[in-house]
């Protein structure tokens, strides 16, 4: 097989990653016509179409293979630059913008512990691109060759990849004190003892839940396991940001199921209350990456592993995820 032109491969990657020819041209600092010419030359060399001209643009199966090959070349270059900098620190410039090392991480991890984990690598100049998605879907980015690693809930290693457990992220249901008092307080009948406002199997259907997006299954999973229900239908509002979900709850939008790492300080300040204090939902997270010998991959894996060990609940969850009693001694996210 003939050697592929690295510039043509990066052109293919830019088209897919930027979602179009015009933005790819801007990223590569070439004309849109040059982008088309490079793609046509690469397709002629391979002998098949590499891009489906749809909205959004999608790579064909052959295109996905070449994308994965391109990312492997980026990884090799990053390894080489890392080694050369140790021998001659002033001999290399920064990595080219189009040669970013891409990983997929779930939004809640980005909002809590993942960025501190990667800060030192960023300061060292590793050109990273972090793609966020729901924790149940980040592995699809790895499966399709768009990233070289991902944080996900998938336990089984993907083909050609290795996997290691990171620990469990603990989730609780939260609301503002006013919302809880107005919407979650139980009416007391004759002889009933008053109870603190809480989410129950009787009132959850009438309460709005703030979720990340339509793929977010955490609220339904939490309610279903908390109350032993197989099917759960919730009244949901969608806010596609972990931090902004908390802001929406603070604004009185409703209840949300969020990481304790985000909620504990707000509960201590009296801004939020635990809407279901008897329950915590642990979600086990795993780090998947290509099964390659690479200093960059090793550095990424070590950085995520070390920080996760400090802030997540240690040890893999065996079998189906179970609701566990709330632990008041939650460890805080490391600050660096």
Predicted regions and their residues:
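Hydrophobic two-helix hairpin corresponding to the core of helix-turn-helix DNA-binding domains
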Residues: 12, 24, 60-63, 252
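Short helix-boundary/capping micro-motifs
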Residues: 13-31
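A short LG(V/I)-centered, amphipathic sequence patch enriched
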Residues: 43-62
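Alpha-helical linker/hinge and terminal dimerization helices associated
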Residues: 45-46, 66-94
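Central regulatory/effector-binding core of bacterial HTH transcription factors
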Residues: 95-159
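A late-sequence structural motif
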Residues: 113, 275-330
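Secondary-structure junction motif
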Residues: 195-229
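Hydrophobic hinge/microswitch elements
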Residues: 229-274
């Amino acid at each position: 097989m003939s050697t592929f032109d690295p510039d043509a491969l990066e052109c293919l990657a830019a088209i897919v990653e930027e979602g179009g020819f015009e933005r790819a041209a801007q990223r590569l600092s070439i004309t849109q016509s040059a982008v088309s010419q490079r793609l046509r030359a690469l397709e002629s060399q391979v002998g098949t179409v590499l891009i489906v001209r749809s909205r959004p643009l999608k790579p064909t199966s052959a295109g996905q293979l070449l994308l994965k090959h391109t990312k492997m070349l980026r990884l090799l270059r990053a390894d080489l630059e890392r080694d050369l900098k140790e021998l001659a620190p002033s001999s290399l410039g920064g990595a080219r913008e189009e040669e970013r090392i891409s990983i997929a991480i779930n939004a809640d991890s980005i909002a809590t512990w993942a960025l501190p984990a990667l800060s030192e690598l960023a300061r060292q100049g590793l050109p990273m691109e972090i793609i966020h998605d729901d924790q149940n879907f980040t592995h699809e980015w790895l499966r399709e060759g768009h990233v070289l690693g991902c944080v996900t809930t998938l336990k089984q290693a993907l083909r050609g990849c290795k996997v290691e457990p990171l620990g469990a992220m603990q989730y609780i249901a939260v609301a503002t004190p006013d919302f809880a008092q107005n919407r979650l307080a139980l009416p007391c009948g004759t002889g009933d003892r008053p109870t603190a406002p809480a989410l129950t199997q009787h009132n959850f259907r009438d309460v709005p839940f703030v979720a990340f997006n339509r793929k977010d299954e955490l609220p339904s999973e939490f309610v279903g396991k908390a109350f032993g229900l197989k099917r759960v239908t919730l009244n949901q509002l969608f806010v596609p940001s972990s931090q902004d979900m908390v802001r929406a709850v603070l604004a009185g939008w409703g209840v949300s199921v969020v990481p304790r790492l985000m909620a504990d300080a707000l509960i201590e300040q009296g801004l939020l209350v635990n809407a279901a204090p008897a329950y915590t939902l642990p979600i086990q997270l795993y780090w998947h990456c290509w099964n390659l010998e690479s200093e960059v991959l090793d550095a990424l894996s070590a950085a995520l592993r070390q920080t996760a060990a400090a802030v997540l609940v240690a040890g893999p969850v065996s079998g189906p995820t179970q609701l566990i009693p709330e632990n008041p001694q939650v460890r805080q996210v490391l600050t660096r």
